[in-house]
């Protein structure tokens, strides 16, 4: 059983206790830790939407330490990151593998980071199905469709050609932060907080 620390704050109404993750959400910090699955994705999506409602112009920071997980759950987080108004900066702590690497790469341009000793891994989606030949063919085609969609997302956020993305994604590809930066998965490797560029107010483009 995982022990979650409790933080006690003094307020004008007395003491108030938060679990550590809820307290960090108040600072606009969201954690993506462990396998990505539907329940976790629902919580993260809710946090993103809540923080947007609190302040639609202030950055949200997402810390990622995940081996990956369910593609549909990860894409629900990805779509919400793109949907909301605030910039979402991403930071890899530990590892960002599979869907974790996609979320890391999906951060706002110029605000995708990794700590020095993290690792990033990308690969194509996998799956298995037992049943009649026709059903197996249906599921195989779906996996190929998802593979194409994920490749297009990496292409969009890294600036690499689709052909290069397909080559990199063919097998498990592990990278240190420096290689991930050269590949376009992140923008910067940071060792200290002062190196992290977080904008309090998102600069809106003027329509002329």
UniProtKB/Swiss-Prot annotation:
This is ATP-dependent Clp protease proteolytic subunit. The keyword Hydrolase applies. Belongs to the peptidase S14 family. PROSITE patterns: CLP_PROTEASE_HIS, CLP_PROTEASE_SER. The active site is at 98 (nucleophile), 123. Its main location: cytoplasm. Fourteen ClpP subunits assemble into 2 heptameric rings which stack back to back to give a disk-like structure with a central cavity, resembling the structure of eukaryotic proteasomes. It is found in: Cytoplasm. It comes from Wolbachia pipientis subsp. Culex pipiens (strain wPip). GO terms for biological process: protein quality control for misfolded or incompletely synthesized proteins. It comes from the Bacteria. Coiled coil: none annotated. GO terms for cellular component: cytoplasm; endopeptidase Clp complex.
């Amino acid at each position: 059983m995982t022990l979650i620390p409790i933080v006690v704050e003094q307020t004008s109404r007395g003491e108030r206790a938060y679990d550590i993750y809820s307290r960090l959400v108040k600072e606009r910090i969201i954690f993506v830790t462990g396998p990505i699955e539907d329940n976790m994705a629902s919580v993260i999506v809710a946090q993103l939407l809540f923080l947007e409602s609190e302040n639609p112009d202030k950055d949200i920071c997402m810390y990622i330490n995940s081996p990956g997980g369910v593609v549909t759950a990860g894409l629900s987080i990805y779509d919400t990151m793109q949907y909301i108004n605030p910039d979402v900066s991403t930071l890899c702590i530990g590892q960002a593998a599979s869907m974790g690497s996609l979320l890391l790469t999906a951060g706002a341009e110029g605000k995708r980071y990794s700590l020095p000793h993290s690792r990033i891994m990308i690969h194509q989606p996998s799956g298995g199905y037992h049943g009649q030949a026709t059903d197996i063919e249906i599921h195989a085609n779906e996996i190929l469709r998802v593979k194409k969609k994920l490749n297009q997302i990496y292409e969009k956020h890294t600036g690499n050609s689709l052909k290069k993305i397909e080559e990199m994604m063919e097998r498990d590809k592990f990278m240190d932060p420096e290689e991930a930066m050269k590949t376009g998965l992140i923008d910067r490797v940071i060792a200290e907080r002062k190196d992290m560029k977080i904008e309090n107010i998102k600069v809106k483009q003027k329509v002329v």
